[in-house]
A protein has these predicted regions:
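Start-transfer (signal-anchor) and selected internal transmembrane alpha helices
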Residues: 1-31, 112-117, 121-126
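Transmembrane signal-anchor helices characteristic of membrane glycosylation enzymes that use polyprenol
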Residues: 11-46, 97-100, 133-139
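Extracytoplasmic catalytic/substrate-binding loops of multi-pass membrane glycan-assembly enzymes
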Residues: 36-50, 65-77
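Transmembrane-helix motifs of polytopic, lipid-linked glycan transferases
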Residues: 94-117
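Specific aromatic-rich, kink-prone transmembrane helix
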Residues: 106-109, 150-169
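Short helix- or helix-capping micro-motifs
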Residues: 124-136, 174-175
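Short acidic/glycine- and proline-prone juxtamembrane loop motifs at membrane-interface regions
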Residues: 142-150
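Transmembrane helices and adjacent periplasmic/lumenal helix-loop junctions
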Residues: 147, 169-175
């Protein structure tokens, strides 16, 4: 083995977990990118119309009236998106995809807590990979533009804080 090859092998061996995480993250982004233009029935019949109604009624000013059936925080985020432009399908999906990663990281942290091992890098990386690559997670955010990962992230964080006996934080993230 040449000197350069040895250095490459040593680098890979030292950083295998980080390289694994980067590879999974890259794959997760590519798979989600493939769904960027898919428009589900729910997106057509509800989400796009709600976005347009919020935009037509003045963005943030439209929040005085209920638009759709999502909570006010989600509607506020949608209202902010109306000021950016009219690519609403992408805004819905980007928000949900961002929370896919938050959910995967939260689940991985919680799995590490439950494993009670001192060094649990593998638990973290495997949990992250499993969650971020679940077909239901990918379909919900990247293809359908649904917000399931947003709510699930906060539920996982609630469970994590309850496990740590941080009840005030659990109450805050669940609310």
């Amino acid at each position: 083995m040449f000197k350069i090859e040895r250095k490459i092998v040593e680098f890979v061996e030292r950083n295998v977990n980080i390289l694994f995480m980067l590879a999974i993250t890259g794959l997760a982004i590519v798979v989600r990118y493939a769904g960027r233009d898919f428009v589900s029935g729910d997106m057509t019949w509800f989400l796009l119309g709600w976005f347009q109604k919020i935009a037509d009624n003045g963005g943030i000013h439209s929040l005085k009236d209920q638009v759709g059936d999502y909570n006010i925080l989600y509607q506020t985020i949608v209202a902010i998106f109306t000021y950016i432009g009219d690519k609403s399908i992408y805004y819905y999906k980007i928000l949900s995809i961002f929370f896919d990663f938050c959910m995967a990281i939260s689940a991985a942290i919680f799995a590490c807590e439950l494993s009670k091992k001192e060094k649990n890098d593998k638990v973290f990386f495997v949990t992250f990979a499993a969650v971020i690559m679940l077909p239901t997670v990918i379909l919900n955010s990247a293809y359908w533009g649904q917000c399931d990962s947003i709510y699930t992230t906060f539920i996982i964080l609630t469970l994590l804080y309850l496990y740590r006996e941080k009840y005030h934080r659990a109450f805050l993230v669940l609310g």
